[in-house]
Amino acid sequence: MSVLIVTGTGTEVGKTVVTAALAALAADRGTAVAVVKPAQTGVRAGELGDVDLVRDLSGVDDVHELSRYADPLAPVSAARRAGLPTPDLGTVAVAVRRLQADRGLVLVEGAGGLLVRYDHDGSTLADLARTLAAPVLVVTTAGLGTLNATALTLEVMANRGLDLAGIVVGSWPVEPDLAARSNIVDLELLAARPLAGAVPAGAGLLGTGQFLQIARSSLEPALGGAFNAAEFRRRYAV
């Protein structure tokens, strides 16, 4: 897996923290890792963006923000309002392949969900994943409403022939409610596999050393960590 696409079932689901966890684990095992953000929205010039958070949490400096728009909208909408060119996913694919040539892992974090539009032709992160023949890691929420959003994302992936790298809960609550605990089993049924991880809420506020420890316990071995889905299920599921 030299390229991994990280998408979410929506906005503010924990994609950036999960991306940082993946980067931290890769770097810790000695893998040369790069992180690419094709389009950053909702951040003005001079402000810190998602790749800056990834750098701060993971200690990985090889991060690349390819375009930025001030309004917190889909990339195509934010570009239109700013009077700027939309992101070119063909150019993004070239950049990722260039990085891939001498890195062991390239992480590509999308904006919002899988079908958010990047340009006026309707290009999406799903199209980029297909172009790169890269698996997709889906970051989702824990609580009420996650099952429908996750099912829709997985259905789109199946219809487009995209490979699922796993489902990760991006922010597992300190005190999970009934819905969150019940959703563990249902998310695994949707994915037809165990959860690939669950990152504790607040992980994005930790320092680099503590964050690495959390990353290791929050992601499954296939992603570089030591997360045990069966143990997590026994502890929380109802």
From Swiss-Prot:
Pathway(s) where this gene product acts: Cofactor biosynthesis; biotin biosynthesis; biotin from 7,8-diaminononanoate: step 1/2
Major subcellular site: cytoplasm
Localisation per UniProt entry: Cytoplasm
CDD domains: DTBS
Required cofactor(s): Mg(2+)
One GO location term (cellular component): cytosol
Gene Ontology biological process terms, A to Z: biotin biosynthetic process
Top-level taxonomic group: Bacteria
Residues at which Mg(2+) binds: 16, 50, 109
Reactions mediated catalytically: (7R,8S)-7,8-diammoniononanoate + CO2 + ATP = (4R,5S)-dethiobiotin + ADP + phosphate + 3 H(+)
Positions annotated as active site in the UniProt record: 37
Entry keyword annotation includes Cytoplasm: yes
GO MF: ATP binding; dethiobiotin synthase activity; magnesium ion binding
Binding site for ATP: 12-17, 50, 109-112, 170-171, 200-202
Enzyme Commission number: 6.3.3.3
InterPro entries in UniProt: DTB_synth_BioD (IPR004472), P-loop_NTPase (IPR027417)
Matching PANTHER family: DETHIOBIOTIN SYNTHETASE
Subunit structure: Homodimer.
Function, as annotated: Catalyzes a mechanistically unusual reaction, the ATP-dependent insertion of CO2 between the N7 and N8 nitrogen atoms of 7,8-diaminopelargonic acid (DAPA, also called 7,8-diammoniononanoate) to form a ureido ring.
Protein name: ATP-dependent dethiobiotin synthetase BioD
Organism, as annotated: Parafrankia sp. (strain EAN1pec)
